Structure formats: C-alpha cells, structure tokens
Design a protein with these regions (language model features):
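Membrane-interface helix-loop junctions and terminal tails of multi-pass membrane proteins
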Residues: 1-244
Length: 244
C-alpha cells in the first residue's frame, strides 16, 4: 500500500522521535547524576539505540520505509532508490522528530540535569563528541559506522528474505545498531545520523542547563557530513552488488 506523503512524513517524525527517546534517553539514564541507571554501562546505551531503531522500523517500515535518518534518505536518493522530490520533506520531518524526542528526554530527566555538574556527561546526552579530540578520527568513525549501518539495513530490508519476513529483518537491523554502538561507539558515541546529532546539539545550546559547558559547534559538521558520505557509499555497495 502506498500511503499519502503526509502519512509518510508523520511516520518519519514519530519514528525519529522514538529513536531519540530510546537512544539518548538511555544515555541520560547512564550519565546523569542520581538516576536509577547511573553508571549502568555502555551495553545499556547500546541496547537503547538498538531498540530505538528496531521499534520504529517495525512500526513504520511499511509506511515510510522508516529511514529516521537524513543520511539514509539522501543515500537512497543518490543511488536511485528513493525519489528526490521527497528528500527535503523527509529530512524536515526527521529533524523535527529528533527535536521533539530530545526535548522529551530533557523534560523527563530535568531534575538530574540540574544535579549533574559534569559538562561532558551532559553534552553526551544530547550529541556526539570525539573521545580523543581528533577530528579525522571523528569523521572516519562516523563515516565507516554509517556505511555499515546503511549497507546492512538495505541488505536486510530489501533482499528477498527481508521482504518475506519484514519483522525479522527489522529486528536484525536493530541488532546491527546495537552491535555498531558496542563496537564503534568508543571514539564518538556514535551518531550515525545527522538528525540525531544536529537537533539535540541545537537544544543543548538553547536550553538553560546548569553546568552544561560548550555545545562544540566547531566540530558539529562532522556528525552531519560524515554519516551522509558513509551512507552514500553503503547504499552504492548495496546497489552494485545486490540490486538487479
């Protein structure tokens, strides 16, 4: 069934919001002071992001494709898998969804933001940074991580077995994200998604959070550009080797 564009955009909006609630919500639970999950560990965060992708793909994959990621949308368009006419509306819906999702995380954890004095921990609940402050490493990590994500997701959801059992394919995509966060999350987070980084970073800059420190706009282009580059390569690999 082909849904109207408004319905597809609604799916992208709510899907991206859910991604933020599960993903950055899990970071807030681990990093912010005096939460029930304080210091619960990296696996808790990886699980949050895995579920944060899995559930929207299960819920909205048949409606909009559940891109929930501007890099995925642009990459599919560049490689002829998605109409260019829908790219800008999809990206706007994703950006607004990320904004809403992060705002919900902030409101939910508001008392703990006030109690937390670690500026890096606070920033980490909004956006990515490079653990070693090396921009080249930051770019490469985000590029390769998104390449694997997009290549893996397209293989799961577009090949014959995934089309026959979309629910199973969606679950596997969630595990790909879970695995990527555990394996490639050390250097940068990772972001793997321009909307997941840009809009929360904007909120971090705007919101009156005590002890929040810098929003680090000097490196903010990296988790926007690098995922797009990686996604385009990942989608190209899928088209070259498997799409016929």
């Amino acid at each position: 069934m082909d849904y109207p564009l408004f319905t597809k955009l609604s799916a992208e909006f709510f899907g991206t919001a859910i991604l933020m609630i599960f993903g950055n919500g899990s970071v807030a639970n681990v990093e912010l002071k005096n939460t029930k999950g304080h210091h619960a560990g990296w696996l808790n965060i990886a699980m949050g992001y895995g579920f944060g992708v899995m559930f929207p793909v299960l819920m909205f994959g048949s409606v909009s494709g559940a891109h929930i990621n501007p890099a995925m949308t642009i990459a599919q368009a560049v490689n002829g898998l998605f109409p260019w006419s829908d790219v800008l509306p999809y990206i706007v819906a994703q950006l607004l969804g990320a904004l809403l999702g992060q705002l919900i995380v902030y409101i939910t954890y508001y008392p703990h933001y006030k109690e937390t004095e670690d500026a890096e921990a606070i920033l980490g609940t909004f956006c990515t940074t490079d653990a070693d402050n090396q921009k080249v490493n930051y770019f490469l990590n985000e590029m390769f991580g998104t390449l694997v994500l997009v290549f893996g997701a397209l293989c799961c959801l577009s090949l014959a077995w995934g089309k026959q059992d979309y629910a199973a394919a969606s679950i596997v995509v969630g595990f790909i994200v879970w695995g990527l966060v555990t394996s490639m999350g050390g250097p940068t987070g990772p972001g793997l998604n321009p909307a997941r980084d840009l809009m929360p970073r904007l909120l971090h800059a705007i919101l009156p959070i005590p002890h929040k420190g810098s929003s680090r706009w000097g490196e903010a282009w990296i988790p926007v550009v690098a995922p797009i580059v990686g996604a385009i390569i990942g989608a190209w690999l899928f088209v070259f080797f498997f799409a016929s």
